[in-house]
Amino acid sequence: TRIVYMIYVKKVLSIKPRYDNLPKYLIKELLSFSMWIFIMNIIDKLYSTTDTLIIGYIPSLATVGVAVYSVGVTFQGMIQSFSSGLTGVITPKINMMVFSNTSSSELTNTMIRIGRLQCYIVSLVASGFIAFGQDFINLWVGSGYSEAYCVAISVTIPVCIPLVQNVALNIIIAQNKLKFRTIVFAGIAIANVIGTVLCVNAFGIVGASVVTGCTYVLGQGLIMNWYYWKKIKLDIPKFWKNVGPMFIFPAILCICFI
């Protein structure tokens, strides 16, 4: 596809890129940005497949355990897909605001507005699954996969934190400040491997999913929120004062239906 696109640009549009006069600082920034994005994607892939690989090495869990765990993790991917649609729409606006040197207070206000919309989506999907997910899994794949419900909850609830803060992620991408996030992800990925190895034998696939959820809360929740607040100068306490209460009503409904 890329080759066809290059041919189209050169032959049909008659556009010939020139690389001889590129400023050195621009090349340096491009390489730095691309490198951290590349490393981040690799770590993200490793993080998402760690539990499955470790579970697969345990004879008693190698077949059924992997299948059940995969079903549970599927719901995490679903809720991320629901939220990512809005993120793609607002990314150009966030980039423009960052490049225009918009104040931190205005970026925070935008983060709150978009975060509230994302919270509606995330809380609706998550609360619906928590309330009716066990019955749905039993109907979908059978009662033998009942542990997939616990796995899904363990990995889905923690992911709600970064999903309502996607604007903050777009901001640090636009500012080319992904280095810290990449290091944090590498750290929690290592912690996830160690924790999963220690817990999977004693607590099975549910233990593995709980460890993954806890490391996600530590990295994406506590550490990254500190970074957004202290280093990127976003008003994170104000954000959670406005967005956090929106989770209360869905949580009450979940408790009533469980």
Explain the meaning of each model-derived region:
Residues 188-191, 241-258:
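Transmembrane alpha-helical segments of multi-pass transport proteins
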Residues 26-34, 70, 115-116, 147-148:
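Primarily residues marking transmembrane-helix entry/exit sites
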Residues 3-48, 93-109, 230-244:
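Interhelical loop/hinge segments that connect adjacent transmembrane helices in multipass membrane
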Residues 1-7, 40, 44, 73-76, ...:
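Short runs within selected transmembrane alpha-helices of multi-pass transporters and secretion channels
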Residues 34, 38, 42-54, 58, ...:
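Short helix-kink/termination motifs in transmembrane helices of multi-pass secondary transporters
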Residues 38, 42-78, 93-97, 134-144, ...:
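Helix-terminus/linker motif at the lipid-water interface of multi-pass membrane proteins
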Residues 63, 129-160:
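Interfacial segments at transmembrane-helix termini and the short loops linking adjacent helices
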Residues 72-115, 119, 169-174:
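Helix-loop junctions and terminal segments of transmembrane helices
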